Amino acid sequence: VTTPTGHTVTPLHRNRNYRLLWTGSAGAFLGLFALETAMPLLILGTWSSAALTSVFAAVQTTTTVLCGAPAGWLLDRYDRRKLLVLAETARAAALVTLALALWLGQLTIAHVITTAAVLGSMQTVGTARMLLVRASVPDEQLTAAVTGEEVRNNAAELAGPPLGGVLFALSPVLPLLAATALFMVSAGLTWLVRLPARAQSPAASGEVLKGLTAALRERTMRAAILVLMLINSVAWIAQLVTIVLLRQHGIAPWLVGLVVAGFATGALAGTVLVAPLQRRLGPGALLLVVGLAQVPTLAGLALPLGPLWAALMCLCFGLGLPQVRVLLDVLVIRQIPDERRGQALSGVFTLLSLSLPIGMIGAGMLMNYSTPRTTLLTLASILLLGVACATFSRSVRTARWPGKS
């Protein structure tokens, strides 16, 4: 491929490092999304506790928050490829022990919660894959590479939940073993990646949060992060509540997985809307539109109209999610120097995850003392209130993309 400047670059499909990272990441994401359905089903089937499913999710996100800044520091100081291999191997090891305990009939709540902590802490190191991809392709191909990542992630999110549901229906141990194998495939392919040596920044111990403060220094990013935190937390909580709601109505596990896959189906379809919407709306206005559009879909999930209707609402909710992810890439990843990019990326993801633990526990308690439908309506109200407050900010409404006046 010849760029407008006359520089010849290797097509992405022939870029060895990119292919290895893309394929390995596809397996890792497929395993993660399969677990998102399988773990709540496992907990509900073993202990019949909706609150415990929320505790599992809350522990996972809490460890992600706590480990975010240290993980970013590690990613900027040490070999990102080796750190990613270590993270994938640790996740596989945790799931193997869980599968063995389940097979032997020795599964305990403490073991499940410990697994949640391992998965959450390694998730922060898993952001290394995003940085490795950017080191594998030239600037001219970065947009195409990011689009390829988005398609891969959404495809995995689409296939993962039904895969988790189907495997769980066959045997509760199968989704754990499948995710283990996929994590190990990812680790093996990542180990084969060969990149030029990167200049390592001798970061001091007091610089752990510098990447985050650099991201927050930008006006649009400060405003966007607040809305992104709300959209992100509501999206994850809504998936969990939907699973509990459908199971309470006797919907089969495999069908629950198909319904929840509607979130990913919408996100995959939403990738075609990224370019046209960004040509017409600034980043702040786009966030507000996405947030407002998701309110009626949350309320719609609360209507007792069956699994087909629920799948349609999940699909509509997911349409706006690619906009959120591309916004992060444009305003954070591309704007921060590589020597601080790990800290900035981990810091922003830490903030996005910050509201999840409280939200997950609150949703679990609300489901215990009321109903999943009430929980969904509460989420819709909170999202509406947050976006409505953000619309009063002129800096959010008039924010523009980098490079535009």
Feature names for model-found ranges:
Residues V1-S405:
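Alpha-helical transmembrane-bundle signature of multi-pass membrane transport and export proteins
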